[in-house]
Structure formats: structure tokens, C-alpha cells
């Protein structure tokens, strides 16, 4: 399963460079999975956190990736694949996602191996706390003239995307669900997925 790059704010699995024909010719089942990006994928707000059972918000793009892996785990045998041999891979933000998924408790038992190229969740600043991400989300909402999540949801998606104008890697956070602690701590304590990992860089 290949996750696209693009700074968690742009890109998709349908880009020609991610086509899997060469792998398919070798008998590999190649899958790309889209995930929410920018304000749709990584936006925290106290009102959103209040809606969830785990009282957190913000890592929707990562949770989309988990859902894609779960779907493949359930259905890949119907396509001739082995649910016990799922490999996740990505470049840039996709590679960062790979290392994030390996640190998430949601991925236990889902993945057999991983490939990351030119990116790691540990290659940036510390992951934002939920409070920090919520505060940033409130400021974004204010800049859009919205005091409530209801107002944001009423805005057409295209308008919201343009007006939010996300131009930097958006704030993912320790939401208590996808991330329960800093990924650096998870890896330091050896609590990440213990699976074969191939890492490197590309151009």
C-alpha cells in the first residue's frame, strides 16, 4: 500500500509516478490509498475533540491511512493477496506517514513490513500536543471568520480549502488515539511495530 507525498497538504495516489505497473508485472499487488490532507486531514479544535469518544481531534489523514490498511487486510485475499504480508510504503510525507503508522497502536497486527523514502515523523519538531493543535485550530477558524465547527462545516469544501490556504506541513498531534505519546518516545522504548523496515532517500 503506497501513500503519496506532498507535505500532508497536497498530492494523491492517482499521480502517474505512483502507478504500480512495474510491480504488478512481478506479481506484486500494488495499491495506492488517498487520505485527507490539509485542513481536512489535520485540523484540531476543542469542539471536534468534544465530539469524539477519546476526546481528541486532528489526525484524520493518518486515520484514513489506517482505515485503508484495515480494508486491505480484510479484502486483499479476494484479489489473490496475502493479508499477512501487507507492506506499507511512501515517499516524503508518505514516508513520514509510514513511520507514524509504525508508532501508532492502531496498526498493531496490520502490517508485515514497511518502506520509507525521504521522510520520517521524527525528522521534524516534536509532535504538537492536543492543546497546541486545538489552539492553532481555533486561530485558523477565527481567521476564516468562524467561531464554531458548525460554521466551518457549512462552508463549501472548495472555499474552505482555498481560504484555509495551508502552505506548511499541518499540525498532527498527540490526540490520545492515533498517537498516545511522542513517536520519538515510542521508538526509544521499543514500542513501535517490530517489522522489517527499508529506509532511504530519493530525488
Annotated model-derived regions:
Residues 2, 14-18, 22, 149, ...:
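Short, well-ordered surface patches within globular domains
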Residues 3-66, 71-78, 121:
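Cap/lid segment of the alpha/beta-hydrolase catalytic domain
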Residues 19-24, 102-103, 187:
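Mature extracellular/periplasmic domains of secretome proteins
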Residues 26-31, 82-86, 107-113, 193-196:
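Loop/turn elements at helix/coil->beta-strand transitions in domains of secreted/extracellular proteins
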Residues 74, 108, 113, 117-203:
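Substrate-access "cap/lid" subdomains that shape
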Residues 88-91, 115-117:
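Short beta-strand immediately N-terminal to the catalytic nucleophile in serine-hydrolase-like folds
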Residues 95-107:
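Short glycine-enriched nucleophile-adjacent loop
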Amino acid at each position: 500500500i503506497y501513500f503519496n507525498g506532498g507535505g500532508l497538504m497536497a498530492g494523491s495516489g492517482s499521480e502517474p509516478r505512483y502507478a504500480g505497473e512495474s510491480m504488478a508485472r512481478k506479481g506484486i499487488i500494488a495499491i495506492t490509498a488517498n487520505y485527507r490532507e490539509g485542513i481536512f486531514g489535520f485540523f484540531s479544535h476543542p469542539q471536534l475533540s468534544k465530539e469524539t469518544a477519546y476526546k481528541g481531534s486532528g489526525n484524520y489523514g493518518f486515520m484514513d491511512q489506517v482505515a485503508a490498511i484495515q480494508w486491505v487486510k480484510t479484502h486483499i485475499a479476494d484479489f489473490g493477496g496475502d493479508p499477512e504480508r501487507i507492506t506499507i510504503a511512501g515517499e516524503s510525507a508518505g514516508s513520514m506517514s509510514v513511520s507514524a503508522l509504525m508508532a501508532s497502536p492502531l496498526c498493531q497486527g496490520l502490517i508485515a513490513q514497511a518502506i520509507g523514502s525521504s521522510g520520517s515523523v521524527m525528522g521534524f519538531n516534536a509532535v504538537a500536543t492536543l492543546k497546541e493543535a486545538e489552539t492553532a485550530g481555533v486561530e485558523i477558524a477565527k481567521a476564516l471568520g468562524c467561531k464554531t465547527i458548525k460554521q466551518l462545516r457549512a462552508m463549501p469544501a472548495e472555499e474552505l480549502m482555498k481560504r484555509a490556504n495551508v502552505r506548511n506541513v499541518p499540525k498532527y498531534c498527540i490526540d490520545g488515539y492515533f498517537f498516545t505519546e511522542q513517536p520519538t518516545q515510542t521508538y526509544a522504548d521499543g514500542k513501535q511495530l517490530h517489522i522489517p523496515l527499508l529506509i532511504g532517500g530519493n530525488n
